[in-house]
Design a protein with these regions (language model features):
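N-terminal intrinsically disordered/low-complexity leader segments
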Residues: 1-6, 73, 206
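Helix-turn-helix
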Residues: 10, 14, 18-56, 60
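Amphipathic alpha-helical segments used for helix-helix packing
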Residues: 96-120, 172-176
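Hydrophobic alpha-helical connector segments
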Residues: 56, 71-101, 157-163
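Amphipathic alpha-helical packing segments from all-alpha helical-bundle domains
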Residues: 67-70, 117-147, 157-161
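Amphipathic, non-transmembrane alpha-helical scaffold segments
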Residues: 4, 54, 58, 62, ...
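C-terminal peripheral helix-coil segments that are non-catalytic and often amphipathic
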Residues: 91-94, 135, 139-147, 161-206
């Protein structure tokens, strides 16, 4: 790895810290440069523009989540489809939903992508990582259909995206609200309730 690539990765790591702490709105390239102790021109040279930097941060953060989810998925391939999807849902909730800083970042990212009108090409790597995570859940679902532990719910993609968005949105709403509703115990109880609803919906009780 050359010096330029090392410097770019260093700036990227600093940018992730800033975005996780402060969100995306209101954070400028100058703010990132200051945090990394680099010139603004260097930050632009590494990433081109702010949108590209934000998307690279999002990709990097989701890659870390994806890799950890994959470890859990591959470790439990011998389990039934229902057990796999239950384990994945619980782990996803712990890894993604219970991470308040990441939930806030995702909320800020959604708003940013709409405002900046990111093109399909610009989002390609980001969307590909989310698809890889979805594919693991889909694999568990399909196995459950074969081994009889999961019932056919029709459109699994629709259910998956509704379920994951519900979990993430719950965390985001409670995080934004603050106060007593933001206690770890309260958040975890609500997440557990949603997980139980989702996994019960899958179960084949015949």
């Amino acid at each position: 790895m050359g010096a330029k690539e090392r410097n770019k990765n260093y700036v990227l790591d600093k940018a992730k810290v800033v975005f996780l702490e402060k969100g995306i709105v209101g954070v400028s390239m100058a703010d990132i440069a200051k945090e990394a102790d680099f010139g603004v021109a260097s930050v632009y040279r590494y990433f081109g523009n702010r949108k590209a930097l934000v998307l690279e941060c999002a990709v990097s953060l989701w890659k870390d989540k994806r890799d950890k989810i994959r470890v859990v998925y591959e470790k439990n391939l011998s389990q039934s489809g229902f057990e796999q999807i239950t384990i994945l849902t619980k782990y996803f909730s712990w890894l993604v939903v219970s991470d308040k800083a990441f939930s806030r970042f995702l909320l800020s990212l959604d708003s940013f992508l709409l405002t900046e009108d990111a093109t399909q090409t610009e989002r390609e790597e980001y969307d590909e990582i989310l698809l890889e995570i979805y594919t693991m859940f889909e694999g568990a679902y399909k196995k459950g259909l074969v081994d009889g532990t999961i019932r056919d719910i029709g459109s699994f993609p629709d259910f998956y995206f509704a379920a994951t968005q519900s979990l993430i949105s719950l965390s985001q709403r409670l995080t934004m609200r603050g106060g007593a509703s933001l206690t770890d115990e309260s958040l975890n109880d609500k997440i557990k309730l949603l997980i139980n609803m989702f996994t019960t919906y899958f179960a084949n009780e015949k």
